[in-house]
Amino acid sequence: PIEPNDYVLNFQQTEHAAWLCMIGNLKKWKEGTLKREMTVKGQPITLTATRGECHGTSHWVDFRWDNPEITFADILEVFGELPIPPYLNRDTQESDKETYQTVYSKIKGSVAAPTAGLHFTPRILDTLKEKGIDLEELTLHVGAGTFKPVKSEEIEGHEMHTEYISVSRGTIEKLIAHDGKAIAVGTTSVRTLESLYHIGVTLLKNPDATEEELHVRQWQPYETAEEAANITSVKALQAILDYLNHHKMETLHTSTQIIIAPGYDYKIVCAMVTNFHQPQSTLLLLVSAFVKGNWRKIYDFALGHDFRFLSYGDSSLLIP
C-alpha cells in the first residue's frame, strides 16, 4: 500500500487508493487509464486504474472509483482473486478461501498464507494450551517478493522485499518472560521475531528513533553484528517495551527487509515449524542458516521418504 501506506487504512479507503503492483502482461498496458464497470454490494460503480512510475519490478497504480459508500476492501472482495501457488496449475476455487488459510488468521494484507500454520487445527491449538504452552500471535504481511527466486550467483546480488509487521505489547512481554526465546511457526514468524531483536538494538542506540528508522534493512544484522554481540534478546526486547511505554503504544508497527542466510546468528527463534521449500528461494537460505550444515541431510531424508514439498506439503520441527 502507498496511499495510505497502512494496510488497514488503505482497505478502508473510499474513492481512491494507491498501491505498488506487480503487473502481468505489462506490454499490453501501453499507457493511459484502464476502466471497468462493476457491481459491488448491489451498487454499480466505475473503477479506473492509472499506471504510474516504475519501482524495480513493480509499478505505482492509482485506483479510483465513483461511489463513496464502497471501500477498497469491498472492491478487492469482488474484483480480486485469491493468489494460490502457481504450481497447483489450476484456477482459484471458492473452497480455497477456507482451505488456503490458517484457522487463526484475522488481519487482511498478505499475498500468501503462512502455510506452516495450515497444519494447526483448533483441536491441536487447544491441546497445546492444555499442555501449558503459551501461544502468541503476530502479523507480517507477506509480500509478493517472497516468491522471487534467488537468481544471482552471490547472495549479495539479491534484493529482499519490504514487509510490514505488527507485534503487540503483550507478545513482547511474553517473549521477555520466556527469556527472549520462542518456537516460530513458519518463516514469516521467523522473520518477524528476528527483526524484533534488531529493532531493539536500534532503540538501544537511539531511544527516540522514528517508525521509519526502526525499519530493519536487508544487511543490517550483519553490519551491526560486532556492536550487538553482547546484547541479549531480553535486553533488545525490553528496549522495544520501553519504547511502547514511552509513546503510550499498544502495538509496534514497522517494516523489515531482513535477509536470513548462512552466517546469520539467530537471536530469538530457538526452534521452528516449517514446510519444505524449493531451491533458489530465500526461505531455503533461512532454513540453512538455522540448521547450519544439516539442511542437505534433512532434505535428502524428505526426498527419500516421499515427503510433500511447498504450501500444501508436509511440515517439520527444526531444532538446531
Put a short name on every predicted segment.
Residues 1-320:
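Surface-exposed, charge/polar-rich loops and edge strands
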